[in-house]
Amino acid sequence: MTQKNFVELRNVTKRFGSNTVIDNINLTIPQGQMVTLLGPSGCGKTTILRLVAGLEKPSEGQIFIDGEDVTHRSIQQRDICMVFQSYALFPHMSLGENVGYGLKMLGVPRAELKARVKEALAMVDLEGFEDRFVDQISGGQQQRVALARALILKPKVLLFDEPLSNLDANLRRSMRDKIRELQKQFDITSLYVTHDQSEAFAVSDTVLVMNKGHIMQIGSPQDLYRQPASRFMASFMGDANLFPATFSDGYVDIYGYHLPRPLHFGTQGEGMVGVRPEAITLSDRGEESQRCVIRHVAYMGPQYEVTVEWHGQEILLQVNATRLQPDVGEQYYLEIHPYGMFVLADAA
């Protein structure tokens, strides 16, 4: 069954003076999906979020929510909620009052409001915190209160503006899992903004990568990582080693190293291939074309991050710390897993 497109941007452009921040963007978010805007600072992702929210108006184009043109509607008329990086909680109110503030403004009866606040706090693992204040809880708990405040209103669309940026690594991991769990549980159509690739992969059905106001590629996290469409995408989605290659009927040749050609490779002749660090291993045996020299080793806990020189090119790979302990200057033979390669159709 095809999912309904619930949020849609049609030919949307946004200018600030003479500066074009968003250039003719088309974007759809199917009902119940989490779509993440990912890109470097200044790429336009937050501007798109603000356009969907109604905090900015497009210079050109239209915005639809649930089939209705909301281009010129205010944020109050769009039935959306936003979770901010800064939490935006009221310090003079209790947590229960913060969570229930929107319902209070809507005139929800006191008894119903109290019950829904209790339920919302329980959803984010803060049951019994109604009477505490913002300065009595941690940053991670504050972000969960902000999430409860958004969920309690049961919005059509939920927007996330880099909500985990102020949290440490462990809190980010647990909070992103909680966001994804609740988004799927309540089937809320959501748009998420981040510059963190691992965060985008963990929470998203679909990731949209932006650069300089343009969409570079759209796809599932797996597709974007395994089949990047350009040199920019290959490097932005994670570490990537890029090699000139020759493609024949049965093989891929990289610096004389012959690899079985994967079935999905359609290219013939000369081209560029990419290989992720985890698809390269080191061996004590191999052909002369595979010989490499260790140039740098960094211990990363469960693995070593190793830089080797291979045919005059420095490449990055990962080595399991329990299996091999390479030292600078040692020689090994490099092995590439054929199905860890991708072809760059656009090497620009």
Swiss-Prot record:
Binding site for ATP: 39-46
Misc. comment: In E.coli, the afu system seems to have been deleted by an insertion sequence. AfuA is totally lost, afuB is partially present and afuC is totally conserved.
Catalysed reaction, written as an equation: Fe(3+)(out) + ATP + H2O = Fe(3+)(in) + ADP + phosphate + H(+)
Record key words, sorted: ATP-binding, Cell inner membrane, Cell membrane, Ion transport, Iron, Iron transport, Membrane, Nucleotide-binding, Translocase, Transport
EC number: 7.2.2.7
Annotated GO biological process: transmembrane transport
GO terms assigned for molecular function: ABC-type ferric iron transporter activity; ATP binding; ATP hydrolysis activity; transmembrane transporter activity
Family: Belongs to the ABC transporter superfamily. Fe(3+) ion importer (TC 3.A.1.10) family.
Gene3D superfamilies with a match to the protein in the record: 2.40.50.100, P-loop containing nucleotide triphosphate hydrolases (3.40.50.300)
Subunit structure, as described in the record: The complex is composed of two ATP-binding proteins (FbpC), two transmembrane proteins (FbpB) and a solute-binding protein (FbpA).
Provenance organism: Escherichia coli (strain K12)
Segments passing through the bilayer: none
Superkingdom of origin: Bacteria
Function of the molecule: Part of the ABC transporter complex FbpABC involved in Fe(3+) ions import. Responsible for energy coupling to the transport system.
One Gene Ontology term, aspect cellular component: ATP-binding cassette (ABC) transporter complex
Chief location bin: membrane
Membrane topology: Peripheral membrane protein
Name of the featured protein: Fe(3+) ions import ATP-binding protein FbpC
